Every structure is written in C-alpha cells, then in structure tokens.
From Swiss-Prot:
It catalyses: S-ubiquitinyl-[E2 ubiquitin-conjugating enzyme]-L-cysteine + [acceptor protein]-L-lysine = [E2 ubiquitin-conjugating enzyme]-L-cysteine + N(6)-ubiquitinyl-[acceptor protein]-L-lysine. It holds the Pfam family zf-RING_2. This is E3 ubiquitin-protein ligase IPI1. Residues 1-42, 286-311, 426-455 are annotated as: Disordered. Disruption phenotype: Altered plant architecture, including increased number of tillers, enlarged panicles, and increased grain yield per plant. The keyword Nucleotide-binding does not apply.
C-alpha cells in the first residue's frame, strides 16, 4: 500500500518534467525505477527532476541547492531561474513560456531587493504614461524618476545662434583698448523683444600710442545711466579712418530717442554720433592693413588747432550733449542727424540738477600726457560726486563752454589763436580708490560747480 502511494507522486513529477523534453522524461523513468527499488527496500525516497537550465537534478524537498517551483508546476534551481528571469527581464517559465505573477520569496518569507522584478511595476500605469514607449522604461520607474527628453535640451544652442548679425567681434588694436561686443538675440523673430547687447572694454598694451590710453566702463540699470569717458587715439596725420563695420546695439529703454547716423569728420577722421537711434545703434570697429582704428559715438568734439588732435570718444553718451570748441571745424552739420544747441537747451536745463561735478585744476603728469602747453589755469578737471562709480578726470577748457547751448561766462575765445582743449579720461581700476584732487594753483584758478544730466 505504501509503494502505490509512492508511485503516484513519481509519475506526476514525470509528467511535469515532460514539458522540458526527453531528458525530463528519461529522468521521470529513472525516478520510477528508483521508486521500484525503494518499494523493494521499503524505504521512501525524494522525487528528483532535472533543471532545464543547468540540467542538474532538482531534488524536491531537500538538497544542497535551493529550488523554486513556478505556478505552472515546473521546478528549477533558485539561482538558475533567477538568472533566467533577469536575462529576459520578465518572469517567464523557460519550459512552457507562461508568465508568472507575484513576487519571489525565500523559504523564510523574506523578500530581498535583488529578487524584485520590474514586471510588477511594468503594468502599473501610475508610474509612467501609457503612451510612453517601452524602450524608455527602466528600473528607475518604480522610484518615480521623470525622464527629461533630450529633444528640448538639444534646442538650447539654437537660442544662441545668430540670425541676422555677425558673431561677437573683438577688436584688439584700438590704440590700447580691447573692445568686445556680445549679443543675446532671440531664436524666433517677434516672439520677445530683442535683448541688449553687451559691450565692454579691456585695456591692452599698445606700442603705437603716443599718449596715455584709458578705458571706459558703462553701467546701465533701468533708467540709470553711467559712463566712463573713453578717449580712443586716432591717426596723427589727419587721414580719415577706414571703412567702419557697424555692430548693432539693442536696448529697449532707448527706443524713445531720435534717430541719427554717424557723420565722418574730414578734420580728425572721427565718426561722431550726437544722438542714439531708435532702432539698433551702430558702433563701428574697422579693418585696416597697417593699423586698426575705431570710433564710438562721440559727445565732445576736438578743438581746432594747428596740429591734429587725438579724438576723445566716449561710448553711447546721452543724446543732449553738445561738442565744445569750433563747431564748424569739428563735424559737418546735418539737420537730420545732428542737433543744434537751441534744440537741446530745454533738455539740459530740465536735468541740470541731477548730478554734481566739481572742477579742479590739472596736475602735470609727464610728457606722455596731453600737451604741456595746454596745462595751467585754462584747464580744469571734472570729478563726479555721484553715488555711482565716479567719472574719470576730464580736462575742460575754461575758455569754452561745457555745453554748447549755455552762454559763455568768460567771453568769446579765439580758437584759431589757442588750440582747443580735449576731454581725456583716466582709467580707474577695480578695487582702487580714485586719486585725490590736487590743490588748485594760485594763478587763474577757481572751482566751478557743473551738472551732468542723467538719463
């Protein structure tokens, strides 16, 4: 009676192993023979089935290796079936291809993290979109990681692509200056207003400069405007400058200003611009075979004299400033671009009290500075007392007017007899305090209160 009870599980195991092929059936037959031998001896033996993965015997109910029985009834070594599941990525029986559902557990009921299958998470629509392709799903989905599409990141360089104007240009030989223009255009026209261009200056060593070179620093914050005057030395023989390649400057705060264009000056070769245009303003850098010279929008002209003067060119100055000295010899008057003194008289008086300046006499700086014959009581320096970074020292001709529209307090000056004075800037480095003003000389000196309007 006990032998018959032993045969039934053995034959059942043989049928279960039949899905694995002939080897399983042979193992079932062998199991039956062993059972017959056990019947003769009267001892029970454990059923043995082969593992279709490693082809080793799977001892049911004991043995050195852990076993796993799937829902379909097939038994495998635990490490073998685990490797098969990991290789396929799905809990599928290698024999009957049936998909298992549930979680793998050890015999003691513990559930290790390495035995967790993503098949449980693959059918959970809470963690990913139903339209998401299968190739994008990974083991990170159970942890609710969101995949960032690379398509949008690849479009980032298009924001910085140049649509209409040239790439940023750097001019390395502005007689001691390094002018760089950078811009941030928008990728789609009309989507957003164009952003401002960024322009800055860096000092460079120049061997062709005959006078001290200086650098500008401009700060723009909303309606606040601040400039350091930047003189750019030019040719000394009166030759006109080479062709200027314009660089666009966009700024939304200046769209209310009138339009103007640069007018070449046959006397000193400076392209002066007295107002900032409505649409992109153009500041020129130029190319030449022998040497490179450049000019920015000029506010103050150069006085006429027997020798050619080095142009003093501040960048992007306010529209209402007028040059001083002999106007007829400094630039060519144009009614469409340059504005006469009576047209700017109201604007100067309206903002006259917004900024304070103090004038003090010039101190001699050596042979490399401006002409020594210009030094003395006829020349003063302007120093800003504003809350922003100070303006550099600028010599101002006491014989001529600071503004072209204000009446002269010292009478009419003969510019043909005395050379006109030039405005000259002084570089103030970062972290250094401005030099103290020198005491005024005893002869022909006074302090004057000046006002520079602020935009």
């Amino acid at each position: 009676m006990g032998a018959e009870e032993e045969e039934e599980p053995a034959s059942a195991v043989g049928r279960e192993g039949g899905g694995g092929g002939g080897g399983a059936r042979a193992a079932g037959a062998g199991a039956g023979g062993d059972t017959a031998d056990d019947d003769d001896s009267g001892e029970s033996a454990a059923a043995v089935v082969p593992c279709s993965i490693c082809l080793d015997a799977v001892v049911a109910g004991g043995g050195d290796r852990s076993t796993a029985r799937l829902q379909c009834g097939h038994e495998f070594h635990l490490d073998c079936i685990g490797s098969a599941f990991n290789a396929k990525g799905v809990m599928q029986c290698p024999n009957c291809r049936q998909i298992e559902r549930g979680n793998w557990l050890y015999a003691n009921g513990s559930r290790p993290s390495q035995d967790v299958s993503n098949d449980d998470w693959g059918h959970d629509e809470d963690f990913y979109d139903a339209n998401q392709p299968e190739t994008s799903r990974s083991v990170f989905l159970p942890f609710r990681f969101q995949w960032c599409p690379i398509g949008r990141l690849a479009q980032l360089p298009s924001v910085f692509d140049e649509g209409e104007s040239a790439p940023p240009v750097t001019f390395h030989d502005f007689m001691g200056q390094n002018f760089t223009s950078e811009h941030l255009p928008v990728s789609a026209p009309g989507a957003t207003p164009p952003g401002p261009y960024i322009a800055y200056f860096q000092p460079l060593q120049s061997s062709a400069s005959s006078s001290s070179s200086h650098v500008t620093e401009r700060t723009m914050d909303g309606t606040t405007y601040h400039d350091h005057w930047n003189p750019l030395p030019g040719p000394s023989d009166g030759r006109p400058l080479a062709t200027v390649h314009p660089i666009d400057f966009h700024h939304n705060h200046w769209t209310h200003l009138p339009n103007s264009y640069s007018q070449p000056n046959s006397n000193n070769g400076v392209a002066e611009q007295m107002a900032i245009p409505v649409v992109p303003m153009r500041v020129g850098g130029l190319d030449s075979d022998s040497q490179q010279r450049g000019s920015l929008p000029s506010v103050y002209g150069n006085g006429s004299g027997s020798r050619s003067r080095i142009p003093s060119v501040p960048p992007m100055a306010p529209q209402f400033m007028r040059p001083h000295g002999n106007i007829n010899e400094q630039y060519q008057q144009n009614s469409s671009s340059l504005y006469a003194a009576p047209q700017r008289r109201t604007a100067v008086q309206a903002v006259q009290d917004s900024m304070n300046f103090t004038l003090f006499p010039q101190a001699p700086t050596g042979p490399n500075s401006m002409e020594t014959e210009d030094a003395g009581g006829n020349q003063f320096y302007a120093w800003e007392r504003d809350r922003f970074a100070p303006y550099p020292l600028m010599p101002v001709d006491s014989e001529a007017n600071w503004w072209g529209s204000t009446p002269q307090s010292h009478g009419v000056t003969d510019h043909s007899a005395a050379p006109g004075r030039r405005l000259f800037g002084q570089w103030i480095g970062a972290g250094r305090s401005p030099p103290p003003p020198p005491p005024p000389p005893a002869d022909n000196s006074s302090y004057r209160q000046m006002h520079i309007p602020r935009m």
